[in-house]
Structures are given as C-alpha cells and as structure tokens.
C-alpha cells in the first residue's frame, strides 16, 4: 500500500470509529462534486439514510451527521456491476481515496476526500427488495420512480415517497431530531427474527458442528465485571442468542440466505458490521455499529457513564 493510501486508510478508519460531525460547508461542496461526476457518467443515484433524512425533514444536513449516504440500484438505466469500477476510477481521478467490497445484497464503496466520508452503496434487487443496513429490506417500488427534490441549490433524487422510506428506516418518530436515541428507533423498527423454535436451534447446532469456523463467541459482563447468565444478545436482522452461566453466547453469523450486514471497510479488521442489542434484567444497550468476525471471541461490558450512543466497543477476547 502506498504511504498516501495508508494515511488515507487510517483517516477513514478513524472517522468511521469516532464519527465526528462533518464540516457542513465541505460536505455541501463534495456532494455537488459527486453529483457532477455521477451526472457526467449518466449514473442515477439517490440520497439515502441520514442524508435523505436531513434533506426531507430539515432541508439541511443533520448537524451531527458524519458522512454522506448515497445509493444506486443496479440494473437501472443500463448501470450494471461492471460499470462500478470505471465510476470509482473517475472518483480516484478527482482526488478521492476509494475502498470497496461486497456482500450478498450489495456492493459498497467508501470514498474519502477533505476528511469527509461518502458511503456509496450499489444495491442488488433480491426478491423485489433492496437491503439497507441493519437488517432492513425495502420494497423496490420505492426506487422505481425516484422523486426530485431541491437541496443545497440543486436537484437530487430520493426514494418515492420519501416519507415512507424514512418511516421504514427510522420508525414513526422520524420527524423528531435525535442524536443518539434514533439507533433504538431503527433497531426496534426491524422486524423480529423468527429464530427461537426447536428447528432453528437444531440448524444452529448442526451449523456449529460442521462449520465451527463460523461460530463467534460473545461474553457479557455486568457493571461489576461478573458474567451474566441468560443475557439476550440480538444481532439485528439475524437472530437472538442467550448467554450461559459463564456469560458466553455462541453466535452463528452465517445461517441465512442473505448477508445480514456489510463487510466492514475497517482496514485492520475483517468481518461484518452489525447492530447488536444486549439486554438482561433492567439493562438494555444498543450497540449500533460493531464488528464481528467468525471464529473470534469478544467481551461486552456496560459503561455507566455512557448508556447510549456507543459504537465499536466490543473487546477481543483471547482464549487459551
């Protein structure tokens, strides 16, 4: 890796883990620059997630937003998977550092310029749906006829109707600005995973026996550092798991037909970014972004000084 690429990768990783608010003036300049490149190459894209939320609700960037969120539907207007690399090459020529990868449901590219991240997803249509992290499947009808809006003095496209898109993503209270509490709204709005029956438990046992490399272990500790028995660990979009008396839960991350999360893009980590809800007794915490790697062990412990808004807090646990 070139020294400049290594430096950019480190900046991108730091911004991903610490999520500082964007400089709004720079974000506006880059969004217009991205639009110019996409329009020049004839690529139809739309504003998604936080960028769409700010544009529709506030007609402005959300003050604490940390990146630009854009989407492209593969197969629209002749844009296919083989068109992605030439597009990313155009961004490299425009001075962007680009990192890309894929999951079952999408191809992603994270662009970096002037300390601003642009999170660009190229969505595959699967069973007339497209996937949004964490575990949300949208009907493709929301993207068949994108809606034009005026934002920062230009015309942009958003899902249509945008209100329905935002309701599915953020819940019925999407019009209320929330810096931290929105994460619980999002995960609560993801349909519950039907995985508690005997058949599913049997599938997990078989999967763990034949594919032990896919099993991840998570140990849950309470405030005093003691293991928690029967804590519930929900991997949003995938399933729920219980800890044993030693505080450990076995997580089977690859039991569904579609990937439930997207590859991390963190340069020193190979794994999936997941949303996790840890609950026991009167305690519940949403960890909106965590990296889980198959065949690794992690430990969770609450922080009484910060009860919401934590990300990337799971510690790796080295077992004998």
What do the PLM-derived regions correspond to, one by one?
Residues 238-258:
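Short, acidic Ser/Thr/Gly-rich low-complexity loop/linker segments typical of extracellular
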């Amino acid at each position: 890796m070139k020294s400049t690429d290594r430096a950019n990768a480190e900046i991108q990783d730091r911004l991903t883990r610490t999520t500082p608010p964007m400089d709004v003036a720079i974000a506006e300049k880059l969004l217009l620059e991205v639009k110019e490149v996409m329009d020049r190459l004839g690529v139809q894209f739309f504003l998604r997630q936080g960028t769409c939320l700010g544009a529709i609700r506030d007609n402005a960037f959300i003050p604490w937003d940390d990146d630009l969120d854009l989407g492209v539907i593969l197969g629209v207007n002749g844009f296919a998977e083989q068109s992605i690399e030439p597009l990313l090459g155009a961004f490299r020529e425009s001075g962007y550092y680009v990192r890309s990868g894929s999951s079952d449901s999408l191809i992603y590219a994270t662009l970096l310029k002037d300390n601003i991240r642009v999170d660009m997803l190229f969505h595959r249509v699967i069973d007339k749906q497209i996937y949004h992290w964490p575990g949300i499947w949208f009907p493709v009808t929301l993207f068949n006829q994108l809606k034009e809006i005026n934002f920062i003095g230009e015309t942009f496209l958003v899902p249509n109707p945008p209100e329905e898109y935002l309701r599915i993503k953020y819940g019925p209270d999407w019009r209320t600005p929330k810096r931290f509490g929105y994460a619980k709204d999002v995960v609560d709005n993801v349909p519950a995973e039907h995985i508690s029956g005997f058949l599913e438990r049997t599938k997990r046992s078989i999967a763990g026996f034949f594919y032990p490399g896919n099993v991840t272990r998570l140990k849950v500790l309470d405030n005093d550092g003691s293991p928690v028995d029967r804590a519930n660990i929900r991997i949003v979009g995938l399933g729920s798991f219980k800890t044993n008396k030693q505080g450990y839960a076995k997580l089977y991350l690859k039991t569904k037909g579609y990937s439930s999360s997207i590859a991390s893009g963190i340069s020193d980590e190979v794994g999936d970014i997941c949303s996790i809800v840890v609950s026991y007794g009167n305690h519940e915490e949403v960890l909106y972004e965590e990296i889980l790697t198959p065949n690794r062990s992690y430990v969770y412990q609450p922080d009484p000084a910060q009860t919401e808004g934590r990300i990337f807090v799971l510690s790796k646990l080295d077992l004998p």
